Structure formats: structure tokens, C-alpha cells
Amino acid sequence: MTTVTDEDFFAALPLFSAFEGVTDPGNYRPLPDGWVLALADIVGSTPAIAAGRYKDVNMAGASVISAVLNSVGKGDYPFVFGGDGALIALPGSLEKQARDALAAVQVWVEEDLGLTLRIAIVPVADTRAEGLDVRVARYSASPYVTYAMFWGGGTSWAEKQMKLGRYGVDRAPAGTRPDLTGLSCRWSPIEARHGEIVSIIAVPGEGRPGQEFRDLVNGIVAITTEQNRDSHPVPVDGPNLAFSLHGINREAKATAPAGRRLRQKLIIFLQLAITVVCYKLGIPFGRFDARRYKRDVAGNSDFRKFDDGLKMTIDVDAEHLKRIETLLEAARAKGIVRYGLHRQASALMTCFVPTPISRDHMHFIDGAAGGYAVAASRMTGKSLSTAPSMI
């Protein structure tokens, strides 16, 4: 019998490529004993979004994934991006590296982005002591990238504990910088092509996903599949070659200390110029193929996920959206679901690209005017007007 090590756990999970598989309990496996959850979210994301700073909030959430994965050698560990935060599951042997990375990114987010990042490390064993679990599935978004799906109630419980101030991590000294190699936010917002970009969060009304909730998720997914490419917000050939100056400035802040940021911006502009020229001419630059890279951006994007509930940011027309809302509202009336939904004109993409030559670059999708954070605020009964987007 083959023994699967902690390092190989996620890679050894069976793959599924039809997104409907997120509701199949047979696709999930419990995290090994002794693992921990490294998680973070932005405190006060609501006023930041209302001030038009959602890209900063998104950047902070993605930086958690970049910092933690870089600190542990970019191993293949399950994680999920939540818009204004993130969660990474790791073997207990890597807890110290994860603590150091979380503490460093907390300082960076505060000093460079002017936001407050809440951080925690929660043992998986503690979720099981509460009668919950953290089970993980491996969804193949493309031949080159897989994303983790989480089920069992444990990640939601861990997030609640973090927000209550438990399982905290000691603060790092001022000036501490995380390793954010590969973190990128160069792309301009991606405009809706079918109607609107809609961010949806749907979680079980009774705390755990029973059959009625699974049927609801399958019904929503079935509606989205009626549109081209399952209502994917990124065109099949990738986003337009349009780049955000604010995003480039943010990326330079993330990947270079203060004294080297001008140089870093020049490097980024040079990379973008090469990309545009190679794309227009259809020629490679060494091993970098701009047209292939742009297509892979679309295929590798995480526009839908399951983390103790359904999260998706889709490009949907009015008729299909109405049917989705009707399903959700009927299920809410029966106590099957709690949900939040937010419409906006465009989507945002924040990227983790260890090397553009490799095809396993990852792209995190959210709405450009509040996305998941606004959807979550509506689920909890808060009021937040549509936020402008400072891109």
C-alpha cells in the first residue's frame, strides 16, 4: 500500500473537472491529522470598499496566498481566495513558516496598503473537536491548474474564531516584508460581455450542506452552463491587453522595497511592452508565448469555488440571473440557504505567477466594485451601496 506524505496529500487527491462535482461528497478527503489552517481577512473592508479601494482589498487577500506559499517553497497545498482574505491548509510541520509569513504580510498590508489584516492559525484538530471537519477536493480548472474545494464546516468555524480574536499570531516587527514573488495585478477590469458581472455567495441555512442545499448548488451551476463557457467572466482568448497603472504601482509595492520601486515599475513596463509586441506579431520571446499565456489566463482562473458554500463571479444576462435569483430566494424561504449577491459592470483579476514560462499560473477573479465582500455584507444584513472602483 502506497503511503502518501503530507507534501503529496493534495496532489494525490482524485481530480474532477466537471464543476458539479463540488457537491459530490465522494470527491472530498479529510485533511490529515496534525494539519493547520492559516487564514486572514481584512478588518474594515466595508469602508475600504465604499471608498473605492477594492483592488487594494483584493491585493491584500491574494498576498496572503503568495506569502504563505512562497514561505513553504511553493508546495502543492490547498488554499482558497475569498476576495478580502484567504485560507491555506498546511502540515503542522510548516506551522512556524506559516506564522512568520502571516505576520510579515500583516505588517506589509498595514504599512504599504494602509489596511488592517487579521490573521490566525487554527489546528484542524480543533475543528474536529467541535464535531466539524475540513475535507478537501481537487478541482481541475484547466490541464495546468487545480484549485481546492473545502467542505465540512471546519473552515467556516475557523474564520469565525479568527474574527472573535482567537488563534492569533504574534505581530512581526515594523518594516518586516513578506516574500510576494509572483504576485501581480496588472490587468485592467474585465468588462461584462453578456450582461453583468455578478458575485454570489450561498451557504447552507443549517450550517452543513444537506441534499437540498446540494440540489440548489447543482441547479445554479446548471443555469450558468447554459451560457457560453459556463458564464466565465474572462474571454476564451484571455482579457484584453489593457493594463492598470494603479495595479502596476501596487505590484511594484508588493515585489520591491521602497528604494527599488521605480526600477521595478520600469521592469514591469518592459515586460508588458514585450508581451504586447509578441502578441500582436504572434512570435514567442524565448520560451514565452504571449498568445498561449493569455489563453491560459482564462483557463486557469478561479471564477467559481466551494468553501463550505458556493462562491462564484460570473458574467450573466438578465434572464439567467433572474432564474438564479428565483432559485436562491425560494431556497432561502425554506431555510435551505443564506445568500448574498452583488452586481457590477466588470470583474477584477489578481494573479499569482511564479514564472510566466510555466503554464501553472493562477488568477483570482472577483467583482470590480465590491464582489464577494459586498455579497457577504448583504448575506449578513449589512447595507453597503455600490462601491466605485479605483483601478
Residue ranges and their predicted role:
Residues 1-391:
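Regulatory and interdomain segments flanking nucleotide-handling catalytic cores
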